Design a protein with these regions (language model features):
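Catalytic core of non-heme Fe(II) oxygenases with the double-stranded beta-helix
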Residues: 75, 79, 83-187
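Non-heme Fe(II)/2-oxoglutarate
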Residues: 6, 10-94
Length: 187
């Protein structure tokens, strides 16, 4: 009941069930600049799993506990995007931001469907350089036994209920970078 009332309060049912999409959160040049910076400077680690029963896919750079070890320009990006998230979804200020990280998938990886957790709101920001439907790279959601897709348009922010089963898809020819913010809904 608390979770549903919170979902109703923040109104994340605009595009499809509990998923909202915002375009042009940052300019294309800023998105490209930050993508290059993250790709070139962040320490990515292999080993993150989507479920306990699946092997690892992709790599992760987790900013959550990096503190002073984050480059100032990247810290600016993280704070700018967080402010944009709060601007679009003001009631997320009443939640606990518990994780910020970047997913990196190399071409033709095949991630698994998963949930992010109970009472979680997830925000994804697409840092890829371009949108090409033939390349793939979308986020897939299982909604009412169908797969719904949000294309990974550069500069796009998608906000969704972390209990929705979803997965990234990789691109065919270039890496896929997605910045993720995860919020815990209060009890």
């Amino acid at each position: 009941v608390v979770l549903q009332s919170f979902k109703d309060k923040i109104g994340i049912s605009i595009m499809m069930e509990n998923i909202t999409v915002y375009d042009d959160i940052l300019s294309p040049s800023d998105t490209s600049k930050y993508a290059e910076m993250i790709f070139g400077t962040c320490p990515f680690f292999y080993g993150e799993v989507d479920n306990e029963s699946t092997p690892p896919t992709g790599m992760v750079c987790d900013f959550t506990d990096m503190g002073e070890h984050i480059y100032p320009e990247i810290k600016t990006l993280l704070n700018t995007l967080l402010n944009k998230i709060y601007e679009k979804q003001p009631t997320l200020k009443d939640t606990q931001l518990y994780r910020i990280y970047v997913n990196l998938f190399t071409p033709n990886e095949n991630p698994y469907f998963h949930i992010d957790g109970e009472k979680t709101i997830t925000c994804l920001y697409y840092l890829n350089p371009q949108l090409s439907y033939d390349e793939g790279g979308e986020t897939q959601f299982i909604v009412d036994e169908d797969i719904k897709v949000v294309c990974s348009k550069p500069g796009r922010l998608v906000v969704f209920d972390g209990e929705i089963q979803h997965r990234a898809t990789s691109f065919r020819h270039y890496p896929r970078l997605t910045l993720a913010y995860k919020f815990l809904i209060p009890q």
